[in-house]
């Protein structure tokens, strides 16, 4: 399976259209992608491959899980995504540059901490939905691996990883 299989899936596209409608006030992509397609597909596939490794499942299995989860839980996927886009994560302390940049240095990104922290114009596209789906699969199927993924892959501190998981669980409980 490929990224194209995911983004052309009717259930995924239905969710994406609803998220677009609900967030018209944000910098949301009018199409599916705003970036160089080939490069972005590679990035998204890498995200899925890495997440699947933390879940101890094949990439194809994770993709199938994402598609089935979306098919069976469309309203949850839409509502969870809308909440994530509209609620600030209540961390107990500011994130470090490493946490904000998922492990990249300021030199590698050539973006100052303040600019990275204040990034409110990030373009929201279908890739955002796919990352939220990965989060949901972790929460519902592989919660024990989620904290490890957040600390190792996304470079969150132990405290921030725990707070992030609680934040997402609270969203689900309140839907």
Description of each model-found segment:
Residues 58, 66-81, 168-172:
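Repeat-associated, polar segments at repeat-unit boundaries in modular proteins
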Residues 57-67, 125-134:
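Short amphipathic alpha-helical segments
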Residues 3-42, 87-97:
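Short Lys/Arg-rich basic patches
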